[in-house]
């Protein structure tokens, strides 16, 4: 079968279907002796001149028709096409290309996934951040966890679009500082401010597993918001009984109501302490008189 392209440049111009930029790409294809099949893929007026350029460059880089057809699709813009073409030129497998050759990824996201492939990340690692809901900055935080040797379980704790890149970094920093999964989980909470996350992380890094942290983990395990769990943990550390605090936690009181109740419980403790102190002081005074 004759696969020669028979149209002349004059024929193409006379058709009047193409812009000057598109014509320039078609003319380059003709001058480079593209086959009929290659030219038929290239000379599509629905492609912009920039998209045609990516198709042309694919053929000039030695890609086959089947390879170029992976990205010669109107669902991709020229920048997305460029990222896919780069992967093909670098001999990525079909499986690797399929991870990011999706229109829902913008060119920057495609670049980060392609860059991961070029740095020999495996499919499981790539899937940790190959999500169009992640920004480039979030992807970089996940890549850093991979680079630093965190386990998949550790990375999965923060590889979630609900965390912004700064919150992700706080969780990552905890693991890099040697904190365990159990120590990091209490502050891996997207509802916490960056300041709250940082305060918790730096506190536990400095003080370790003290009584306050144990109480905090107790109430975070009940899925209480960090601010609420913190109030109860401080109350427990001050001496209020866990039975009373557990009761308050179960009732879902507002923070204002909880603070009101805890204030009264604190006053009761203070009153009892004073009574015990006076009683002890009076007893000592009586003992001294007997002498």
Where are these regions (language model features)?
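General marker for long, soluble alpha-helical cores
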Residues: 1-291
């Amino acid at each position: 079968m004759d696969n020669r392209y028979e149209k002349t440049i004059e024929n193409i111009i006379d058709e009047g279907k193409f812009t000057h930029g598109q014509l320039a790409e078609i003319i380059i294809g003709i001058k480079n002796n593209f086959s009929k099949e290659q030219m038929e893929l290239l000379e599509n007026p629905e492609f912009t001149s920039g998209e045609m350029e990516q198709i042309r460059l694919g053929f000039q880089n030695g890609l086959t028709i089947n390879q170029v057809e992976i990205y010669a699709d109107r669902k991709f813009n020229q920048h997305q096409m460029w990222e896919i073409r780069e992967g093909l030129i670098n001999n990525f497998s079909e499986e690797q290309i399929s991870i990011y050759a999706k229109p829902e990824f913008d060119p920057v996201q495609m670049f980060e996934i392609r860059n991961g492939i070029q740095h020999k990340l495996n499919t499981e690692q790539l899937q940790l951040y190959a999500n169009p809901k992640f920004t480039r900055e979030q992807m970089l935080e996940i890549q850093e966890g991979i680079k630093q040797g965190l386990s998949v379980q550790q990375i999965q704790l923060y590889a979630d679009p609900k965390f912004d890149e700064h919150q992700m970094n706080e969780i990552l920093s905890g693991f890099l500082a040697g904190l365990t999964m159990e120590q990091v989980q209490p502050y891996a909470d997207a509802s916490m401010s960056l300041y709250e996350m940082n305060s918790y992380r730096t506190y536990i890094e400095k003080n370790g597993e003290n009584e306050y942290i144990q109480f905090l983990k107790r109430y975070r395990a009940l899925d209480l918001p960090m601010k609420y769990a913190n109030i109860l943990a401080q109350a427990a550390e001050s001496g209020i009984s866990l039975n009373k605090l557990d009761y308050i936690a179960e009732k879902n009181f507002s923070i204002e109501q909880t603070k009101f109740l805890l204030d009264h419980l604190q006053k009761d403790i203070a009153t009892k302490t004073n009574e015990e102190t006076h009683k002890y002081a009076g007893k000592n005074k009586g003992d001294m008189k007997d002498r």
